């Protein structure tokens, strides 16, 4: 609320009026009527089309193999399709951002954190919006409060929403297992148990597939955004973990302001990459 988010604590009865399928033994909920959801593929393609209209060139299937430097200033990148020259480079490489940072001698503590998800068969109208159990964010921001080692290891919790086609997307896990993107029966069972705990009606719904992706994890749960002290022209925009799609527009806006104007309209200091460089030094 202090940040201007429209959110309130509601009772269990009020929560079930919004989502009638909820279990009868919940204590209450946090509710944000202005929350929304997007299709990440359509959004990404929309960003790409908008960028092209503004003159951007998008080079796909092109790996950056090194960064061209002149003293402490970046001047371009070496890639598998030749060299590209620019006085400004933004490292927005997600779970692979630490590798790109290493190319300029930076040790950024970004690691891949696997998330496993499940997709159900299409069913009738089941719910509106997105629901997350409290553990979903506790595991991200306050893992020290989790006492069960198995829960902590897999980070199994609940995030659920219904797609336009009627299927449910149910997550998920938060696993620090490197770049492994395989699904595991143990994790799927843990997710399903959590889902049925909050939505008993799901016990008879069929699962049609499962998949996994990687989120860019940081030790303090905050993204790494902004200029890097001592490196002219090098900027970070990574480490958003599971919030990358939601925070992409504001990240791009504020970072563009910092690059072009030297100052952003909302301070990026809490997210500065320099917080980790200072700790490392």
Regions found by a protein language model. Name each.
Residues 66-68, 73, 83-88, 93-229:
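Active-site substrate-recognition segment that forms the wall
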Residues 50-54, 99, 103, 258-262:
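Active-site catalytic microenvironments for nucleophilic, acid-base chemistry
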Residues 1-14, 18, 157, 195:
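Dinucleotide-binding Rossmann-like beta1-alpha1 core, especially the glycine-rich loop
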Residues 11, 60-62, 209:
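Short loop/edge segments at beta-strand edges and connector loops
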Residues 9, 14, 56, 222-224, ...:
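C-terminal lid/capping helical subdomain adjacent to the catalytic/cofactor pocket in oxidative enzymes
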Residues 30-88:
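Helical element adjacent to the flavin cofactor pocket in flavoenzyme catalytic cores
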């Amino acid at each position: 609320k202090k940040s201007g988010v429209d959110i309130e604590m509601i009772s269990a009865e009020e929560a079930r009026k919004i989502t009638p399928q909820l279990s009868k033994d919940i204590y209450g909920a946090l509710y944000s009527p202005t929350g929304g959801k997007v299709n990440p593929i359509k959004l990404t393609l929309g960003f790409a089309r908008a960028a092209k209209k503004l003159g951007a060139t998008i080079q796909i299937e092109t790996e950056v193999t090194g960064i061209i430097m002149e003293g402490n200033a970046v001047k371009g990148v070496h890639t598998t399709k030749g060299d590209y020259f620019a006085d400004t480079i933004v490292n927005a490489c997600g779970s692979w951002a630490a590798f790109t940072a290493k190319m300029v001698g930076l040790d950024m503590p970004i690691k891949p954190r696997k998330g496993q998800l499940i997709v159900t068969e299409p069913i009738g109208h089941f719910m509106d919006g997105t629901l997350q159990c409290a553990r979903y964010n506790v595991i991200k921001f306050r893992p020290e409060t989790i006492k069960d080692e198995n829960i902590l290891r897999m980070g199994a919790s609940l995030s659920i929403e219904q797609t336009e086609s009627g299927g449910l997307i149910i997550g998920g896990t938060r696993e620090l297992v490197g770049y492994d993107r395989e699904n595991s029966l143990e994790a799927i069972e843990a997710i399903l148990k959590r889902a049925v705990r909050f939505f008993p009606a799901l016990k008879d719904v069929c699962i049609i597939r499962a998949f996994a992706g990687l989120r860019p994890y940081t030790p303090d749960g905050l993204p790494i955004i902004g200029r890097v002290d001592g490196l002219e022209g090098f900027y970070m925009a990574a480490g958003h973990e599971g919030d990358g799609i939601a925070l992409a527009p504001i990240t791009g806006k504020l970072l563009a302001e910092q690059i072009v104007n030297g100052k952003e309209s909302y301070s990026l200091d809490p997210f500065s990459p320099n917080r980790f460089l200072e700790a490392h030094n």
